[in-house]
């Protein structure tokens, strides 16, 4: 890895680890608003088209304290973290908030933000989850229009189609650059660690896209392909809203696995789909919402023509993954409801899989290590080509 | 006379176990040291004792495999395997008809489904909770003011099924004390806790699917009441090796031989197993089973 790559990567990691610092610097430099975006489906191009900075709000690594009195303990760690951040003043840096997703836990945390930061506009429009209904498309287009109107109101800046198109193009370029890196990993290039890839995605959720793309280009220009080694190939699946702890990635690799693909929100899911530049921009943003669920189906959406399990089987074929690690955020209802279906499919196809339930605080490292190593040993011992002799151990 | 020797070392959360095999997979020695907590010295003692019983030195060992939570601490280790793989291997060698292993150790419990070849097909284990593990029985013994080795016999005398709702190893102690304060018979309390723990284990079994041919391993399998109440919950008899606690180290030693020699040990040989059983029984010294002075008293 060359000097420039290291520097660029270091900046991306630093932004991913400390969004507040980047946001503060950006505000000081640009004197424009920063809008906090709740995951998963809000089209950030709308905010960027006003000149404001859209930032997808990240899970904080800080232990939840004050947030525990605001949301019950059966809310997921991410939503309790948002409540905690709001209570500790960590969201004060945002000028407004936007949300397009109807997760009951997420809405709880949005309500906390609304309650604790009464002077900040908090806007919610529900992008309908029933993708097949005859009225869904029209309604999604109406919601996109509503978001645009609200973004204009909050920022005081009109949004032209030209500005929207320019932002669509810069987001597409950013996604394409990231997709190239993820495709290289899928095809056998192990030049970036899972933690580095996550830092690239998370920093993209925070930074100005042109600035982020420039750093990515610098990373790619100097990157040298690294052939995949003989470690067991795994697919990481789950975590729809926030980033798993990097310690988990490190543990997986330490156990003798290599992550070759994923469908994480802070991974392949986030960059899966471009917004069509050939369509009128407002329609294209609505279309993106539907196209996204076809590229990597989300269990929070209902669509008869696609399903997550079929996608996963296909993804495993493409990457050559030998097993699946399902990372489920504790109390994520959508994931909990869908998981039995996923497990059934993986069992039917005799694909080794392991469920790891994640929490905001505490990771039982040694028990996870034992479970992951046992899964890897199972894959190795059942595969004649994977048997290890004393010499190769 | 064997020309090669292989060792399996299982460094668990409360005990260290070592098994030495010859090149025909015959058990030459097996040794257990009760530590109370993960201890490098306890492991060294188990290894030294196993080597001494086998009449060989460390340099004579061709290949060693470490297992258990402390597997990376094992000296001269060729490679490591999880205790899931090792218990499965040990059980598959001794019980060719086995389909399911219930391994309850000091701080965790695991249910391992085996395929037709005796390889791990699926498994489930507790992760954040010590409920139903050896630690839970220690809490019970402490609350009942008896030795851990007596708690099973006491439970077998219980006749009443008392309500034990807490399955947290920490909070259970207060519930047990509360029952005793209400005048409950300690035997009934012990039996009720065993019954409740057995149903907890049943939950793990359900995660991989109940099947015939169940073998129970781990230190808790030495507790006759734990076995009895688990069988009652399963509505099925289980088989328990003569020394269930050594199964992980035995499996590790078998894997050491197999990896080193490149051949699979598939033949069930009662004579070889008998050696395992008798040697283990011979080394079961009350001194090395007490907590925690076992190590100092062996010096």
Model-based region annotation:
Chain B
Residues 172-205:
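Adenine-nucleotide phosphate-binding core of ATP-dependent small-molecule kinases
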């Amino acid at each position: 890895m060359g000097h420039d790559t290291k520097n660029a990567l270091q900046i991306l990691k630093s932004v991913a680890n400390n969004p507040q610092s980047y946001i503060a610097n950006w505000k000081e430099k640009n004197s424009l608003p920063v809008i906090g975006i709740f995951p998963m489906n809000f089209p950030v191009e709308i905010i960027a088209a006003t000149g404001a900075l859209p930032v997808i709000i990240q899970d904080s690594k800080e232990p939840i304290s004050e947030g525990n009195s605001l949301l019950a303990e059966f809310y997921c760690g991410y939503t309790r973290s948002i409540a905690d951040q709001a209570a500790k003043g960590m969201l004060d840096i945002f000028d407004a908030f936007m949300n397009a997703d109807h997760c009951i836990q997420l809405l709880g945390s949005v309500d906390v933000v609304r309650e604790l930061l009464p002077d900040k506009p908090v806007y919610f429009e529900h992008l309908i989850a029933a993708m097949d209904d005859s009225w869904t498309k029209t309604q999604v287009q109406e919601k996109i229009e509503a978001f645009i109107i609200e973004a204009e109101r909050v920022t005081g800046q009109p949004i032209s189609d030209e500005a929207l198109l320019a932002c669509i193009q810069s987001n597409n370029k950013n996604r394409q650059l990231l997709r190239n890196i993820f495709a290289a990993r899928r095809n056998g290039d192990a030049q970036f660690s899972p933690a580095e890839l996550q830092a690239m995605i998370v920093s993209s959720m925070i930074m100005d896209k042109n600035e982020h793309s420039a750093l990515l280009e610098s990373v790619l220009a100097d990157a040298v392909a690294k052939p995949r080694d003989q470690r067991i190939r795994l697919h990481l699946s789950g975590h729809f809203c926030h980033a798993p702890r990097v310690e988990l990635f490190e543990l997986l690799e330490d156990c003798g696995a290599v992550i070759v693909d994923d469908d994480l929100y802070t991974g392949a899911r986030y960059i899966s789909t471009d917004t069509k530049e050939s369509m009128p921009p407002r329609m294209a943003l609505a279309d993106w919402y539907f196209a996204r669920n076809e590229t990597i189906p989300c269990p929070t959406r209902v669509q008869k023509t696609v399903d997550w399990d079929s996608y996963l089987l296909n993804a495993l074929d493409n990457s050559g993954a030998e097993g699946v690690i399902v990372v489920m955020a504790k109390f994520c209802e959508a994931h909990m409801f869908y998981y039995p279906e996923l497990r059934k499919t993986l069992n039917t196809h005799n694909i080794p899989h392991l469920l790891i339930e994640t929490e905001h605080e505490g990771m039982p490292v040694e028990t996870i290590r034992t479970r992951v190593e046992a899964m890897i040993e199972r894959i190795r011992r059942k595969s004649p080509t994977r048997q290890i002799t004393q010499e190769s151990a | 006379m064997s020309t090669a020797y292989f060792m399996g070392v299982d460094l668990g959360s409360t005990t260290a176990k070592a098994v030495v095999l010859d090149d025909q997979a015959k058990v030459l020695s097996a040794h257990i040291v009760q530590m109370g907590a993960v201890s490098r010295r306890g492991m060294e003692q188990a290894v030294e004792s196993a080597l001494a019983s086998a009449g060989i030195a460390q340099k004579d060992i061709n290949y060693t495999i470490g297992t258990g939570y402390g597997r990376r601490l094992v000296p001269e280790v060729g490679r490591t395997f999880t205790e899931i793989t090792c218990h499965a291997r040990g059980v598959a060698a001794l019980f060719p008809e086995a389909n399911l292993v219930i391994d309850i150790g000091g701080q965790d419990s695991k249910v391992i489904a085996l395929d037709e070849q005796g390889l791990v097909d699926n498994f489930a284990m507790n992760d954040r909770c010590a409920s139903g593990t050896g630690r839970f029985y220690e809490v019970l013994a402490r609350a009942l003011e008896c030795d851990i080795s007596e708690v099973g016999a006491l439970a077998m005398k219980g006749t009443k099924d008392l309500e034990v709702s807490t399955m947290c190893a920490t909070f259970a102690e207060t519930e047990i004390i509360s029952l005793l304060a209400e005048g409950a018979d300690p035997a009934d309390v012990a039996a009720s806790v065993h019954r409740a723990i057995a149903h907890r284990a049943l939950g793990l079994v359900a995660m991989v699917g109940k099947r015939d041919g169940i073998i129970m391993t781990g230190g808790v399998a030495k507790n006759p009441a734990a076995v009895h109440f688990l069988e009652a919950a399963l509505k099925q008899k289980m088989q328990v090796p003569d020394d269930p606690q050594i199964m992980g180290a035995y499996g590790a030693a078998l894997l050491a031989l197999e990896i080193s020699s490149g051949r699979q040990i598939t033949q069930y040989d009662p004579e070889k197993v008998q050696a395992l059983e008798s040697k283990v029984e011979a080394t079961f010294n009350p001194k090395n089973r007490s907590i925690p002075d076992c190590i100092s008293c062996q010096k």
